[in-house]
């Protein structure tokens, strides 16, 4: 399981919370992904992973460096 530092911008945190995803949910999904991919709309790295309560999330992020992730968006998806 990789470890990352997360660089949270307040607007991004508000944006993902509007989708029902907390910081902790996002970080859990990104640090322990089920699959990794890329966003079709932006080409940014993305993953499918689990929220702390078991919901399946799709998370999009950017690498600022090898260890630092900037969240972009996240939302719940169906299997």
Model-derived segments and spans:
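Ribonuclease/tRNase effector modules and their secretory precursors
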Residues: 1-79
């Amino acid at each position: 399981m990789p470890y990352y530092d997360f660089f949270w911008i307040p607007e991004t945190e508000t944006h993902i919370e509007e989708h029902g995803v907390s910081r902790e949910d996002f970080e859990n999904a990104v640090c322990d992904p089920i699959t990794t991919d890329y966003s079709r709309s932006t080409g940014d790295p993305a993953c499918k992973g689990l929220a702390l309560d078991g919901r399946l999330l799709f998370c999009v992020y950017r690498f600022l460096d090898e260890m630092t992730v900037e969240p972009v968006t996240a939302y719940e998806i169906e299997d």
